[in-house]
Amino acid sequence: MEKSPDLVLIQATSIRSSNLPLFLIHGDDGDISKYFLLDPLDRNVYGIRNRCCDSAKAWPGGIPEMAKAYLDLIRAVKPRGEILLGGWSLGGLISLEIALVIARNQFSPLNVEGIIMIHTIFPSHQLRIEQVSKRPDSNADSHNGVGPCMIHNQRMIATWRPSPWPIRHIYTGLSDFESESPIVPQEPERISEIRYRQPPPPTILLRARHPASLVARCNNAGYCADTHCHRPMLGWESYREDFIVSIIDIEGNCFSIFDNNYVEGYISTDTLLDLHPICNRIAVVQFDAPVRLYLGLLVITLIDNKNNVMLFHYFTVRVNSDICIISIDLNLPSTGPISQTVNSKLAALASTTQGLNVPVLDLIFPTAAYTQLMSDTGAREMDQRKRQKDFTHTTIHDKNS
């Protein structure tokens, strides 16, 4: 795919950096110039602009069409691996739709590790489409068609609702399962199936401190304004209670938050660390013999030293010859059939490895953690006290643990 003028590199970092790239989607005005005001984030940061604003035209397919087009732009520079998404206002909604498109494809080589929403309001709290349609295109003579662009975008928002997170089908139950596919077994009669609704990426909400001035300014400008933006989560509690993992109040209102006297420090490396999936942990395990293990939440495959490959979230990660990594999705209830399946699998692994003691490490970003772990020659010489922790204790923990 040829380089598109709609995808702009805003910040560049060292080619050796393992920090996840951040893709920031335009706001209601279709512009990305405001993102150039952000502090250095020690990663590649890209901005995606709305090309339709140049001609003041609308996207016929609305937000879903925009998400698919923008995903193609992302794949052009990051065809596989983990990414972060984000954006101001409408950009947060498009980021969520992109994440949904990726999540629906179980074999997608891309994975969204987190989302940053900059004063993005849940769309059910916007004015209804009838009210938006009555707004005159009074700003049609605005610079570069920004006025009509915002009207088109508000109409799209008024008709869009985020879909529930996709249901995954996970097969478990075989320790000697030799299929090359992480999903479909060669002997399905020997496999049990678990269906679960996977959690969305951890999301940070940057919330403007002055919603009242936001509403007044929107109304005066003739745009659709949200009359419920005083809600603590800007309405996202109506989507999923576990969707927003952190709320950060920022100065100004939705229009002024990118003013020079406000913008410093809004998105920083510390903010990005908050996107750490707090319910995920990894365990580093040494095996003397080839082992294949299937857990009921994620397809987790430990492969023998000869192949030296592990499938994780359907991604392939190279590891050292005698170290494999287990990742357990802990963002689920601590009781019930699914967690019971996981506990039984953990117990089976402990039995298989004859009570192997395993240390547990916290993850910030998986890619960076893997790189650091694999390059750290001291990883095999971990503290002996940590090694005393029995593997059977590395079970599902509460989200707040």
Curated annotation (Swiss-Prot):
Keywords: Hydrolase
Listed EC numbers: 3.1.-.-
Organism domain of life: Eukaryota
Keyword Phosphoprotein: no
Pfam family, one: Thioesterase
Biological process, per Gene Ontology: biosynthetic process
Spans annotated as Disordered: 379-401
Protein source organism: Gibberella zeae (strain ATCC MYA-4620 / CBS 123657 / FGSC 9075 / NRRL 31084 / PH-1) (Wheat head blight fungus)
Protein name per its UniProtKB record: Probable thioesterase FGSG_00047
UniProt function note: Probable thioesterase; part of the gene cluster that mediates the biosynthesis of gramillins A and B, bicyclic lipopeptides that induce cell death in maize leaves but not in wheat leaves. The nonribosomal peptide synthetase GRA1 incorporates respectively a glutamic adic (Glu), a leucine (Leu), a serine (Ser), a hydroxyglutamine (HOGln), a 2-amino decanoic acid, and 2 cysteins (CysB and CysA). The biosynthesis of 2-amino decanoic acid incorporated in gramillins could be initiated by a fatty acid synthase composed of the alpha and beta subunits FGSG_00036 and FGSG_11656.
Pathway the protein takes part in: Mycotoxin biosynthesis
SUPFAM superfamilies per UniProt: alpha/beta-Hydrolases
GO molecular function: hydrolase activity
Family: Belongs to the AMT4 thioesterase family.
Organism placement in taxonomy: Eukaryota, Fungi, Dikarya, Ascomycota, Pezizomycotina
